[in-house]
Structures are given as C-alpha cells and as structure tokens.
C-alpha cells in the first residue's frame, strides 16, 4: 500500500513499452505527478528527449514526425478539446494517449472522430490522479482549497467542481491500490459528507464493475474528515526537518525554491529536491527534530571533508582513475552537503530573527497545556514584542481564541484589539471568522484533550512525566483518530458509514482523506504510526499540503467570498 511505487510503475509501463525517441506531453497537474517520482535523467534513459506542456504543444506548428508523442494528462473537457485539435493537425509520428483517470464514453468518441489520419496507437487509463511525495502521503494540489469553507448556497458550481475533483482523486488512489473501501465521514462536515456519498455512488453504482476487486479478509476503510476539526496543527511553528522546511521556506512537490531566500548568492538561488526516495540523508532525518539535524549535518560535513581530502591526494595513474570513477558520486555528495547546510543555515537565521523559540514555546503551551491567565499574559507580551512578526502575532491570537473561546470574553476582545493595532495588515474579523468555521461548536474531536475523561487523564500523565522536547510536544488530532481506528473505537455516531456497507472489527488498511489539506506534522504521525506494526496501515491524503501561510491565505479567501456572498444571498 505504497502510492509512490504505484505511480512509478504506471510511468515505467508508459515509457518502456514504446520504443524509440519520445516526447512526453503533460498538463499542469500531471507534471507534478511525474516530476515527484521520476528524475530528468531517468526520463532520458527511457528515450524521452523532450517534455512539453499540452498548452504549448497546441501553439507550435513545427512537424516532428520522427518523435512518438506520449500524452499523460487528466481527462478534462479542456484537455480533450486541445487533443482533438492536435489530432486533427498531427505533428508527431505516433500518438500514445494515457489518461490519469476515468474517460467518459463521449470523450472516447470525440478522440476517435478526431483521429482521421489514424496516428493514435493506444488509449489507456493509468490511475495516477494524485501527487504522492512520500510513501504514505498524497495530495491533490488544489488551488481552490478555500472552497471547503464556503456554504454551498454562496458558490454551488464552485463547490461542485471542488467535490468532483476530490472524488476523482480518491477514486484514482483506490484504483491504483486495487481496493474498494467501506466509507465513513465526519458527521459535522457537510463537505466531507457530500464527498463521501459521491465517492460511494461512483464506486458502488456508476463504476461498480471497475471497483469489483478480489475480496480481502477485511475491507479497507476510507475516512473523509474536515480540516476544520483540527485548525491548531496548521497554525503551529514546526521543529522537525520536513515540516520545518515547508513552514519557513516552502516545499512544493518535494522541491524547495531557494530563490525565495533573498540573502543567498545568485549562483545558489536554485531549486533543490528534498525527496526521501532520492536523498538518503533526508530519508533518515526528515522526521528528526531541529537540534538533532544540526548534529547530523555536522557529521555529514565531516565525512565529506574526509572524502575531499583523499581526492586531493592524487599521486599515481591508479589514483587518478579512481578519482574519475568516483567523481559523479563525489559531485552528488558535494551537492547534497551544500543543500542541507544551506537549508539549515537559513532556517536558523529565521528562527533567530523572528524569535521563534520564544513564540513556539507559547504556541505549544496554548495547544497542549491549561492555564488561561498565564496564556493571556504570554500572548500579550509577544504582541508587544517588536521582534515578533505579523504572521506570528496573528497565529498566537488564533491559537489563544481557539483554546479559550468560552473563557473571559473581555480579555479575548482585548487581544483582538491589540492585534488590530499592532498588525493592521490583517483584515478585521479574521480570528472571529476562524472561530465561526472551526470553533468548539463546530468540532467533533477532542482537540485540546479537555472534553473526554480519558484524554484529560492522559494529558495529566504526560505533564507529570515531563516532555522530552517542549517544541514538539503537540500531537495532531489525527493521532487520536488513528488510535481510535486501531482499537476499533471510532464512534459510529461521530463518523457514520455511507449506505449499507458496514465494517465488522478493525480494518487492516485505512485511507484518511482530509478535506482542506494536510500538514507534514500529520504525515509524520502517519509514518510513525505505521512503524509501530499495529496491524493497521494508514495512508493520509488531502486537497493540499498546508503550512501556516497557506492555511491563513485560504481562510482570508474564504472570508472574502463569504462576505461578498452574504451580500448577494
């Protein structure tokens, strides 16, 4: 149940069965699916000499009949129209058409009618309609991620497109895994309910035969949940490597754009890859905390210096031959050392400049510990601190408001006013909009561990034992959800089943899909949970991979649309 492998296998089959020189044609979504699992050099090995976007191919008129065109695109109306035009005026010798999801019969007829010169050799469906950067984590990279917060009456067609794209993505995941799941959803989320029901309709009615795979001992589970049940996790600063890079610099499809770091010399302002599949150091350190990363990078630098020293000591022809043989590996090692040193150095500067250790300690207290009075004092002090950035002030007030929504409204209003005066760039009412979206009345789970007696006892025990690292003591709500599933205790009343497909006992395979987006802290929780060998394997997916900046951007956009929509309705 590893999605990266499924996607790689699809692309392997696509490219190796077609001999000769090829051009690979992608769209704005499949380019991410391919680039995250396949490197440029691997494409060259498969005789792919050109990678083009379907949009630019439409514009060009140059004939390239010596090349075979391999299309890998989503089966959207827009793509079908572009393909129709390209088949009517073929530039390539052969056309091999691969679609990342289900084609409609009408689309197949359109393509057949357009292929008057009979250049199409094959039409296939390869179900890779998702981006899988880590073994147990996938995303749909949805630009319109804010739509899950908009009431259906405000933008019905936008929400329908959003739901359709999510259903397509979930369907592709299960077709890639060759499974048909039992489906459950979070009761308090209309969007999760809608997606769960539409997915069930596709799998059990419209495409029942396609999803009729060999029965396994227990049916896998698809659980559709809503980001708003845990608004705390995407608001926190992060202190483990992968999550921290995404929070402070940004990680898109396993790539970090160093151009966003203005202080670097021009020759270092490049895009670097951070992939557990391609980088052994990153694979073994992606979930480690920041303090340990520094020590591990120092060890890597020491190892590299030893290799560099031995390369300087070239005295014989044999030494020279050995150096030439080892040079590609040496250059790769040099690039890797440089990449990780640059990232950690830049993050250290940001931590210092934004006083993130002080800010984060208060964040963790707000997320994990009680004490409203002390929390109010700490947040007030940080709002007054000139070194604290606007985004950090906003996040602190949001975390405080989520935690103490029902306590001391006067102090809460004082924090709102102070935030408005200290950080006027944020629209008034954004914190209140968050509470309206994800406040205590809207949530299903025990987010702060203070509703359920068992959770209260567990938090007290953790407090008494002490916490190994004050900056990483927070656990996402997802951790509790996985624990409930593993123990067979996920409540039907909170997470109802769709239709009459129920589950006896606990499932062995679970896909949790989070409408509104996941975080790298949550994907870390999934990886650690899978490493415990509990007998249940989890995959986490979502509409986007969030950091606090993206979560707040989505929130602002939803607030803007809700305001204009409320005037219209």
Curated annotation (Swiss-Prot):
A GO-annotated cellular component: plant-type vacuole membrane
Protein name: Vacuolar protein sorting-associated protein 45 homolog
Principal location class: Golgi
Function text: Involved in the protein transport to the vacuole, probably at the level of vesicle fusion at the trans-Golgi network (TGN) and not in transport from the TGN to the prevacuolar compartment, by promoting the recycling of vacuolar sorting receptors back to the TGN. Involved in early endosomal vesicle trafficking, particularly at the trans-Golgi-network/early endosome (TGN/EE) thus residing in early endocytic route.
Source superkingdom: Eukaryota
Lineage: Eukaryota, Viridiplantae, Streptophyta, Embryophyta, Tracheophyta
Name of the coding gene: VPS45
Effect of a null allele: Male gametophytic lethal and stunted growth associated with defects in vacuole formation leading to reduced cell expansion and autophagy-related defects in nutrient turnover. Blocked transport of vacuolar cargo proteins with C-terminal vacuolar sorting determinants.
Subunit comment: Interacts with both SYP41 or SYP42 and VTI12, but in different domains of the trans-Golgi network. Does not interact on the pervacuolar compartment with VTI11, SYP21 or SYP22, or on the cis-Golgi with SYP31. Interacts at the trans-Golgi network (TGN) with the SYP41/SYP61/VTI12 SNARE complex.
InterPro entries noted in UniProt: Sec-1-like_dom1, Sec-1-like_dom3a, Sec1-like, Sec1-like_dom2, Sec1-like_sf
């Amino acid at each position: 149940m590893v999605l990266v492998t499924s996607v790689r296998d699809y692309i392997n089959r696509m490219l190796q069965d077609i001999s000769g020189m090829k051009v690979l044609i992608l769209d704005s979504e499949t380019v991410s699916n391919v680039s995250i699992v396949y490197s440029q050099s691997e494409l060259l090995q498969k005789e792919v000499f050109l990678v083009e976007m379907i949009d630019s191919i439409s514009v060009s008129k140059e004939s390239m009949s010596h090349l075979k065109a391999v299309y890998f695109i989503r089966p959207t109306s827009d793509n079908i129209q572009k393909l129709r035009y390209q088949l009517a005026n073929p530039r390539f010798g052969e056309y091999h058409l691969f679609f990342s999801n289900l084609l409609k019969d009408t689309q197949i007829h359109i393509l057949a009618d357009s292929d008057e010169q009979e250049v199409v050799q094959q039409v296939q469906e390869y179900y890779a309609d998702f981006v899988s950067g880590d073994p147990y984590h996938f995303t749909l990279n949805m630009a319109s991620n804010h739509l899950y917060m908009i009431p259906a009456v405000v933008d019905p067609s936008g929400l329908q497109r959003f739901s359709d794209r999510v259903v397509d993505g979930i369907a592709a995941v299960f077709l890639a895994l060759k499974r048909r799941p039992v489906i459950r959803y979070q009761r308090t989320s209309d969007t999760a309910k809608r997606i769960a029901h539409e997915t069930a309709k596709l799998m059990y009615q419209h495409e029942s035969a396609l999803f009729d795979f060999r029965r396994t001992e227990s049916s896998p589970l698809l659980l559709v949940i809503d980001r708003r049940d845990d608004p705390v996790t995407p608001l926190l600063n992060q202190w483990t490597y992968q999550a921290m890079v995404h929070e402070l610099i940004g990680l898109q499809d396993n790539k970090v754009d160093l151009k966003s770091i203005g202080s670097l010399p021009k020759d270092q302002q490049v895009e670097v890859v951070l992939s557990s599949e391609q980088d052994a150091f990153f694979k073994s350190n992606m979930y480690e905390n920041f303090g340990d990363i520094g020590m591990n990078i120092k060890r890597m630098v020491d190892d590299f210096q030893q290799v560099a020293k031995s390369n300087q000591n070239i005295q014989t022809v044999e030494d020279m031959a050995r150096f030439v043989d080892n040079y590609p590996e040496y250059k790769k090692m040099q690039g890797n050392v440089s990449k990780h040193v640059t990232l950690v150095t830049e993050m250290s500067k940001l931590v210092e400049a934004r006083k993130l250790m002080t800010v984060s300690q208060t964040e963790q207290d707000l997320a994990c510990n009680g004490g409203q009075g002390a929390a109010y004092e700490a947040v007030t002090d940080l709002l007054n601190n000139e070194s604290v950035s606007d985004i950090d002030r906003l996040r602190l007030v949001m975390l405080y408001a989520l935690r103490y929504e029902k306590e001391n409204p006067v102090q809460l209003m004082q924090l709102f006013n102070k935030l408005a005066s200290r950080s006027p760039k944020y629209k008034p009412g954004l914190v209140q909009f968050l509470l309206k979206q994800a406040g205590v009345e809207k949530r299903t789970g025990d987010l702060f561990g203070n509703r359920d007696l068992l959770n209260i006892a567990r938090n007290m025990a953790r407090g008494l034992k002490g916490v190994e690292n004050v900056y990483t003591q927070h656990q996402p709500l997802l951790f509790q959800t996985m624990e409930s599933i593993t123990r067979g205790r996920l409540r039907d009343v909170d997470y109802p089943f769709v239709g009459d497909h129920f589950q006896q006992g606990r499932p062995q395979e679970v896909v949790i899909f989070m409408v509104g987006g996941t975080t790298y802290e949550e994907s870390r929780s999934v990886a650690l949970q899978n490493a415990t060998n509990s007998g249940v394997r989890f995959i986490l997916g979502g509409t986007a991979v969030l950091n606090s900046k993206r979560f707040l951007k989505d929130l602002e956009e939803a607030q803007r649309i809700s305001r204009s929509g409320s005037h219209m309705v």
